[in-house]
């Protein structure tokens, strides 16, 4: 920008414009006069130090002591002290239950640093040698040494973990047997106790009967691949630090390492056996197997659906073919029976009709003009009848018999005329000649 250039600015807002655009939304409440005093725990602590003429560290130490003493007075459920524990030899400190010494048996590995400090202070206040000296027990400081040793162990994270590794009083033994209803109630505390040794946190819970297959698999996979920080240095045999024999020292260190490895292997085997036992009695595993079996059967059923449909179709086709074959066989049998009956009926009818013809010849004396026909006459009539009978077509024998029956009442001439009619019919038809007959149609 050159010196000759200029910038145009907006005119400033006037007071009138500001007042015109102002919109009040409320009023400020009236002022009230109140008394203000310094309060709070920090002010009270400052006032207390000023009043008693204490330094900061002196005041803090006395307040902690007073607080512990108040807690000691208020707590009515302090652990009872075993008389045998009170007589314990401080030299045998590895044999003592450090949590019991400090009155933390019900907390054990769950006790936090603050609880350990408070418990130690309470025990010190109760069993300090100066306090016992006032009671006449001048040299009775054995249990106080046990208290100091317990606090020394439990206040050191490394040494406390070593003690927790072998603290059998914190273990929960697995149940000998369970039912579907008691499995979770009895096994959950067992796994919660074992979970304290896990490097991986949080540890998956045992769950419930409603847990999914994935959750159950994850739980047992975790325990079968359990990564434990548990060690067994606490059980090491003490190595004398007398400098007399380095070989003995190295030997004892080697022996301690070997024992730690053996204890670790035994503990791993114990834990695996524990998990095996839980898995074998877990009601969910049986349930999952039943569900898997049902799902497998369902998949097989679906997979074989085509084969079943084909088999059903083949069976249906077979049944249809068998039905048709049975119907055809029945129809054939029925037709055969009907045909047989028809043949038998026809045969009977022919036999009956032939009998009518034969009886007609006898009844009308072979159409002889004399009372006793000659043999030649009878023979010629019979031959003519045989010729006529041989030329009869389908149904014509019945017609012949019917015509004879119809004319029998009229007499011999009428019956003879029936034979004549049939003979002439056959001659006209060409099935025979006039020479083929001697008596009829002449």
Swiss-Prot record:
Keyword Chaperone set for record: yes
What Gene Ontology cellular component terms go with this record?
cytosol
Residue positions, PTM Phosphothreonine: 55
The answer on whether this UniProt entry bears the keyword Phosphoprotein reads yes
Compartments where located: Cytoplasm
Q: Where are the transmembrane segments?
A: none
Using the UniProt annotation, give all residue ranges assigned to the region (Disordered).
Answer: 49-84, 242-270, 306-331
Q: Name one GO molecular function term.
A: unfolded protein binding
Keywords, comma-separated and alphabetical: Chaperone, Cytoplasm, DNA-binding, Phosphoprotein
Q: InterPro entries recorded for this chain?
A: DnaJ_domain, DnaJ_domain_CS, J_dom_sf, RAC_head, RAC_head_sf, ZUO1-like_ZHD, Zuotin/DnaJC2
The organism's superkingdom is given as Eukaryota
- Coiled-coil positions are none
Q: Which residues form the J domain?
A: 97-167
**Ranges of biased composition (kind: Acidic residues):** 72-83
Q: Where is the composition biased (Basic and acidic residues)?
A: 55-71, 316-330
Task: Please give the residue positions where the record annotates the modification Phosphoserine.
Answer: 57, 76
Q: Which GO terms describe its biological process?
A: 'de novo' cotranslational protein folding; cytoplasmic translational elongation; regulation of translational fidelity
Q: What does the protein in this record do?
A: Component of the ribosome-associated complex (RAC), a heterodimeric chaperone complex involved in regulation of accurate translation termination and in folding or maintaining nascent polypeptides in a folding-competent state. RAC stimulates the ATPase activity of the ribosome-associated pool of Hsp70-type chaperones SSB1/SSB2 that bind to the nascent polypeptide chain.
Q: How does it assemble?
A: RAC is a heterodimer of the Hsp70/DnaK-type chaperone ssz1 and the Hsp40/DnaJ-type chaperone zuo1. RAC associates with ribosomes via zuo1.
**Protein name as it appears in the record:** Zuotin
The gene behind this protein is zuo1
